[in-house]
Regions:
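Mature catalytic core of soluble alpha/beta enzymes
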Residues: 1-291
Length: 291
């Protein structure tokens, strides 16, 4: 929702929002063989600079920075593992251990180096596949919010598949629990902030009576066995909320909060989160918002 009453450029404004979202989708969709990201992963030569557009460079820079800060708990290079498990297809395809080891050997954010002066990436091994799943929605929201502010829009609420951003007004956002989608496990008030949730129950697959979540642990190459059933992150940048909800789900409370403290101390990025513990259903929360 964008409030733009009595403004003659309304259609142009909304078309601009759609164009930005489409541009991100066409650039980053790893399931589209013609997206720029897919073409790069298919055509790059190990050790050779590969020039990219400004949007793809921004994505790579943002996601690799978070991968480094989280010590790989968030890692965009798990795309091949994600595809092998069938995540996104609706059908679980469990890899053998040896096969999984082979896939893990083709992951690792440290295999990618960026060249800002050339707007290029150097990937030093073959077979890297980059997954934008925990970045793309947040990045698109941030681009659109920046665009709306350039047009002096004062109030907006964006919803990209559960990734939210509220601008101007204060909204009360309900966070759904795992047992009953109609029951809220928490209500959060946000203004000029993004909200992103990672959980096993929003997107999962079943096979032989076992449930598999859609989030992959980069260390094991298997679906995450988290101490949380869900993690909801609140941050003034949607892309950080998107990435950090995934990182915290993988890391757990102690290691995750250390990452949040370093973000505030080194970059001034403030993050709140709340999570439901898997062991007892207790809601835990953390805030490092500057007052």
């Amino acid at each position: 929702m964008v409030r733009i009453e009595e403004r003659p450029e309304v259609n142009t404004l909304l078309a601009g929002c759609r164009d930005l979202a489409l541009q991100v989708e066409q650039t980053l969709n790893m399931y589209d063989e013609e997206s720029e990201l897919s073409v790069m992963c298919r055509d790059y030569r190990p050790g050779q600079p590969y020039e990219v557009t400004a949007l793809l460079y921004d994505f790579l820079d943002t996601s690799l920075s978070m991968a480094k800060r989280s010590n790989g708990a968030f890692d965009p290079t798990v795309g091949a593992v994600v595809k092998r498990w069938g995540i996104g297809s609706g059908e679980v395809r469990i890899p053998a251990e040896k096969e999984l080891t082979d896939f893990i050997n083709r992951t690792g954010y440290h295999h990618i180096r960026l060249l800002p002066d050339k707007r290029a990436a150097i990937i030093d091994i073959e077979g890297i596949t980059i997954d934008p799943g925990a970045v793309g929605k947040g990045l698109a929201i941030d681009y659109i919010i920046h665009y709306l502010k350039d047009y002096h829009v004062e109030q907006a609420c964006l919803d990209f598949g559960g990734n939210l951003y509220v601008m101007g007004d204060t909204y009360r956002i309900g966070v759904r629990g795992p047992e009953d989608p109609e029951k809220m496990m928490a209500i959060v008030s946000v203004k000029d902030q993004a909200v992103s949730t990672s959980s096993w129950y929003e997107h999962y697959m079943e096979r032989d009576g076992r449930v598999y979540g859609h989030l992959i642990d980069p260390a094991s190459g298997k679906p995450v066995e988290s101490e949380f059933t869900s993690v909801t992150v609140i941050c003034d940048r949607a892309v950080y909320a998107d990435m950090l909800s995934t990182a915290l789900y993988v890391l757990g409370a102690e290691k995750g909060e250390a990452v949040l403290r370093s973000l505030r101390e080194e970059s001034g990025i403030c993050v709140d989160y709340l999570a439901e513990r898997a062991v007892d259903g207790k809601i835990v929360s953390y805030s490092n918002t500057l007052k």
